Amino acid sequence: MNRTLTRRRFVAGAAGMAVTVALPRTAAARRRRRRRTADVCIVGAGLAGLTAARNIVRSGRDVIVLEARDRVGGRTRNAQVGPGVVTELGAEFVGPTQDRILALARAVGVDTFPTYNAGSNVLIVDGQRTLYPAATGFSEQSAFVDAVSVIPALDAMAAQVGVTAPWKAPRASEWDAMTLGQFRDANIPSTGGRALFDAAVRGIWGAEASELSLLFALFYVAAAGNPQTPGSFVRLFSTPNAAQESRFVRGSQEVAIQVARRLGSRVVLESPVRRIESGSDTVTVVADHDEVRARRVIVAVPPVLANRIGYSPALPRTKARLLRRIVPGNLLKWEAVYERPFWRDAGLSGQGVTDQGPAQVPFDNSPPQGAPGILFSFVGGDFARAAQRQSTAEHQATFAENMAAFFGDEARNMTGYLEGNWTTDPWTRGCPVGHTGRNVLATLGPQLRKPVGTIHFAGTETADYWFGYMDGAVRSGERAAREVLRSL
C-alpha cells in the first residue's frame, strides 16, 4: 500500500481531523503528479469504495483507490482508549438484515459481539426518571407510549415505498411536500411524546424532524430491512433484533483496514481528488499528487463532497442539483471513559432516552471484556449545532451532568473523554448521513444512483437497503462494481 501504509497509518487520525485547503494547480504541481493507469479508479476509501475495489479486483480488473485522508474507513474511525482497547467515533452498530456488511466482515476475519443490553434502560421525561426493560426496549410511561404510537402508521406508509425507486410510490409527491415534523405534530398528542420522538429522530438522522421530507423518512424506514424482511421504524432505534444489536471486535474501522490491507498498493492515501475529466470511453481523475487514466471511475464519497469535485464536462443539471440538495446531518458522539462499567452494578444497561438535551440517547460502549467502562451518546440536530459553538471542555462538563442524570453521580468521575465531530472534518462535512428536505426526492431522486457516462456513484447515500448505514455503504459498493464490470 502506498505512502508507507502500515496498520498504524490506517488507524492514524483518530485523535483529530486535519484541516486541508485546496492546492494551486500550477504547471509544476501537474508535473509532480504521478501518472497511473487502471481499468477503474475509485474516489474514496470508505466502505463503499473499498468494497467496490475488492469486487472489481476479484473479477480480474485493475483498480486504483484515491483517498484524501491519511487513513481508510470513511465514516468509521477507531480511537484507542487503553492497551488493546478501542472505541468508535463514527459508525459502529450492526444488526439483523444488515447482511452485506456482516458478510464482508466475516470474509476479512472481523468478528462481532453483542451490544450490552442486560437489565434496565433509563427514561427521563419532565425531570422524572423511570426504568424499563432493556430486553423489550419499551416503556409504559405515557409520553413514551405517545411517541411510539405512530410506528404502525409509519411502517404501513413505508410499506408503500419501494427502496429501489421511492419516488414512484403512489403518494410520493404528497409525502415529499410534507416534513416528518408535520406528521409528528398531527399524530403525537403530547409535548413529551413529541420530544421523545424528536430524540430518536436526532439520533437516527442527525437532524430535526422539520428538516426531513416525510417521503425521505419513509424510504429510510423501508430500507431498514432486506429483500426478505420489510423495513420498520423499530429496527432503526432499538437494540435487540435491530440496528444496534452488535458491534465489531477491534472496532468498526477494522473492517475497512482489513479490506485495504488485501488491496495493498492499490490504495493511495493523502491524495484528494480535485477534478474528473471524462470522455466517451476513458476518464482522467486528477488528484493533488496523482493523475489516473482509467476506463471508468466510481465516486464513493458523500454527496456534499462529490459536489465539490470539478467535472469536465459538467454533470447534468439535475444530477448536480441533487448532490447540492442532499444535506449532511449534524451528529456528534460524546464518549466518557471510566475505570469500570459501574452502571451495570445497579442493573442498568447503559441505554436510555430523555426529552432534554443535548445528550439524549446513551449507550454502553464498553469493550467485549467489559473494562474500561465507556458510555457514549449521540448529540444531534439543533443540539449539535449549538454544541459547535462551545469548547470541548464545555462538552465534557455537560456530558458528565447528562450522564449523571441517567446513571448517578459516579458518571461524573470520568478517566477520559473523547468526541467525534464529523461536521468539522473536511473530508466528510457531516454525519451520520445526508438527508433531503421537502420536494427533492420525488423529483430529483431518479438521479441518485444514475451513472453519468464513464462516472459511477457509490456511498451509503446511494444505497437501496440500509441507506445511511455501513451495510448500505457495502451494498452501494457492490452495486457500483457490478455496473462497472458490465461496462468494461
Regions found by a protein language model. Give the residues of each.
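Glycine-rich FAD pyrophosphate-binding loop
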Residues: 57-78
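Central helical "cap/lid" subdomain
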Residues: 278, 287-345
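Active-site/ligand-binding neighborhood in enzyme catalytic cores
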Residues: 162-271, 280-282, 300, 310, ...
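Conserved flavin/dinucleotide-binding core of flavoenzymes
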Residues: 59, 133-134, 282, 300, ...
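Conserved N-terminal glycine-rich FAD pyrophosphate-binding loop of Rossmann-like flavoproteins
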Residues: 71-92
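N-terminal secretory signal peptides and thylakoid transit peptides that target proteins
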Residues: 1-17
